[in-house]
From Swiss-Prot:
The keyword Nucleus applies. May be involved in the polar growth of plant cells via transportation of RNAs. Residues 294-309, 379-392, 426-442 have a biased composition (Polar residues). This is DUF724 domain-containing protein 1. It is found in: Nucleus. Disruption phenotype: No visible phenotype under normal growth conditions. It comes from Arabidopsis thaliana (Mouse-ear cress). Residues 283-315, 368-445 are annotated as: Disordered. One of its GO terms (cellular component) is nucleus.
Length: 670
């Protein structure tokens, strides 16, 4: 294949720092001696921007760096695969490289040697590399590529420091492994958010230490992240460590960056679990930070203070008491030795012997059922003062004196009269109730409940105080029930058979009622008993569509009742379990609404496409009709043309006959 003046050739040049690059050019003179490779020939680049402006003479190049343009037919049927040598159209030159990976959209990653680089090209910008031997074109063999963890073209993550305080991880691609001063390093190319390295989006390469490079974490499927989860969030162009602080609809989250404390609202796809690369293995990072209890995630129960029946309770001492255990034996040890000494010392000053006071022990009540006997631990009294205890002793004596009279009265009272009396009390129509009782019984739902379900059996909480006649007698032979009131109402004897009471028996102490007037204490206690079981029924009958405000109101009411000695652990526990379920259901419902809106939008789009499709079908039908008409006209025209051609041939024949007759006539002898 000869080259001559004004023909198109390819010039090998390294002026721009690129090796193995070929430029299109036009020869300005014909080689006089093809065998002399060192002779320089003048040429001009076909790309005008490469020609140096202001130069008086055109550039020259040795003849051995000139070759013909490869013919296009040599590229037919060439299939690019990993390891194929190719020429890439890059910055007005054909640069030689190796295909290392096939990408989507019919594009390829090409590795270049000098300078080291990896660039993504579409197929139309690539051609198979051919070597010119001087007489023919030869295609090199396919190279065998290495497949190590950090081989060229492998996606990795490189650590970078933000504002000198935060380490983030950027997705990059290994270009080449090098060694500097005996240390292994990598030349990497930072990728864009689409993980591509296109020519128009390419970023400069950088050299990093091997300790700053790690593989990309494997994909971990996470259905939904929870509060306080440690995650990595993709922000800007890097993965940064953070903590989930809020969960929103449509799988969006509020994340606080660990280093800067900035808050971001991101999508689920921009999060991933926090992982650590160590010793060539991925390890789980801290999954969750400790959760501080709050009203939204836990319903706190207020601790009860243990107290002996005859010792004063100061605020300082009250803070030392822990929550009463459900194990009665543990409650006996609630008071420390120091507090016991202090209490007995004060009793001696009051004239009471130390031996005559015994520690408060919890009472055990045995209740028989179908399965056997079960022990129900009782709570200790809440911080009763000496004066309160001494005031109750006369009341208890009075209650004994009046017990015979109450028994005679109960015989004449029917069960319906008792219910009417209690119903009137809860509605506040006939009896005066303390502020505490009113605040608890002021629920409209309580008034509407059947009284048969609202009058459970009441068992008062008792504290045993043993007073010996002298130091030699055995203490604690009899127990006294310390209550703020004497049980005079028939209610206390008539409601123990109620099924609702049997489901969760209660033994409240009602000690806060000592502060109320004596004539309303018992009515307040009855109201609180009715209210508790009404609230218990409400908790049991909770519906999915109940609002969170209703649950909060139930929790607050139960917490108030707990101050009076009610055991509210089970209902509060149930409410605490229902709250997150309602939140999740609300989120799902919101997601459902969003999906319905999207479906509606998609339906509108589909309808529009259907209309467009129908329009196109009408156009196609019309075009077919027009094509049929045109075909018929064409056939008619062809027919006419055929007839005319036949007529023309006839006329031509007649003309020839006339000419022959004319010649014959002219040439006839005289």
């Amino acid at each position: 294949m000869a080259i001559f003046k004004d023909c198109e050739v390819e010039i090998f040049s390294e002026e721009d720092g690129f090796r193995n690059a070929w430029y299109r050019a036009i020869l300005e003179e014909t080689p006089t001696n093809p065998t002399s490779e060192s002779k320089k020939l003048r040429f001009s680049y076909m790309t005008k921007s490469l020609n140096k402006e202001g130069s008086s003479s055109p550039p020259t190049v040795e003849q051995r760096f000139i070759r013909p343009v490869p013919p296009e037919n040599l590229y037919n049927g060439v299939v690019f695969e990993e390891g194929t040598m190719v020429d890439a159209d890059y910055k007005h030159r054909w640069r030689t490289g190796v295909v290392i990976n096939k990408m989507e959209n019919d594009s390829y990653l090409v590795l270049f040697d000098c300078p080291p680089d990896i660039i993504q090209f579409e197929t139309k910008h690539l051609r198979a590399h051919l070597d010119w031997t001087g007489s023919e074109w030869v295609q090199p063999e396919v190279r065998e590529l290495s497949k190590s963890m950090f081989s060229p073209g492998t996606l990795v993550e490189v650590s970078c420091v933000i504002d000198k305080v935060e380490v983030s991880w950027v997705t990059a691609m290994i270009v080449k492994e090098i060694e500097e001063s005996g240390e292994k390093k990598f030349i990497v190319k930072v990728c864009n958010k689409h993980l591509s390295c296109r020519v128009d989006e390419a970023k400069p390469n950088m050299t990093v230490d091997s300790c700053c490079v790690r593989p990309r974490p494997p994909l971990f499927f996470v259905e939904e992240y929870d509060l306080r989860d440690c995650v990595e969030v993709f922000h800007g162009s890097s993965w940064r460590q953070g903590v989930v602080k809020g969960v929103h609809i449509e799988k969006q989250y509020t994340v606080t960056l660990e280093a800067t404390k900035d808050k971001l609202v991101v999508k689920h796809s921009d999060l991933r679990p926090f992982k650590v690369w160590e010793d060539g293995v991925w390890h789980n990072g801290p999954q969750q930070k400790p959760v501080k209890e709050s009203p939204s995630n836990a319903i706190k129960q207020k601790p009860m203070c243990s107290s002996s029946g005859a010792r004063p309770m100061t605020p300082k001492m009250a803070t030392k008491h822990a929550r009463i255990s459900f194990n009665p034996e543990e409650n006996v040890e609630e008071l420390s030795v120091a507090e016991t000494v202090a209490a007995t010392g004060k009793l001696e000053k009051m004239g009471i012997a130390e031996e005559s006071v015994s520690c408060v022990t919890p009472l055990k009540q045995t209740e028989a059922n179908a399965e056997g006997n079960k022990l129900e631990p009782m709570r200790n009294q809440n911080c009763l003062r000496n004066d309160s205890t001494q005031q109750m002793l006369p009341e208890e004596e009075n209650s004994k004196d009046g017990s015979t009279k109450r028994k005679r009265e109960e015989k004449h009272n029917s069960a319906s009269s008792v219910m009417d009396e209690i119903d009137g009390t809860c509605n506040g129509s006939e009896s005066e109730i303390s502020n505490t009782g009113k605040s608890i019984c002021n629920n409209d739902d309580v008034d509407d409940q059947p009284l048969s379900t609202e009058l459970p059996y009441y068992q008062s909480l008792s504290v045993v105080n043993s007073f010996a006649a002298d130091a030699e007698e055995t203490p604690a032979k009899s127990a006294r029930t310390i209550s703020p009131f004497a049980k005079k109402l028939p209610f206390w004897k008539s409601y123990e058979t109620d099924e609702l009471y049997k489901s969760l028996p209660q033994s409240p102490h009602f000690s806060p009622l000592f502060k109320a007037k004596e004539d309303i204490r018992e009515w307040s206690a009855v109201g609180m008993m009715v209210t508790f079981y009404c609230l218990l029924k409400e908790v049991k009958d909770l519906q999915l569509d109940d609002s969170s405000s209703k649950l909060s109101s139930l929790s607050s009411s139960l917490a108030e009742l707990e101050k009076h000695g009610f055991n509210v652990t089970d209902p509060l526990s149930r409410i605490s379990k229902v709250l997150p379920l309602q939140d999740k259901r609300a989120k799902k419902a919101e997601e459902r609404k969003c999906l319905e809106k999207k479906i509606e939008c998609e339906e509108i789009e589909r309808k529009r496409f259907e209309e467009e499709f129908a329009d196109f079908e009408r156009i196609i039908i019309e075009k077919k009709r027009q094509a049929l008409v045109a075909k018929e006209k064409k056939e008619a025209a062809d027919k006419r043309i055929g007839e005319m051609k036949t007529c023309a041939e006839t006329i031509d024949q007649e003309i020839k006959d006339e000419e022959l007759e004319f010649q014959t006539t002219v040439s006839t002898p005289w």
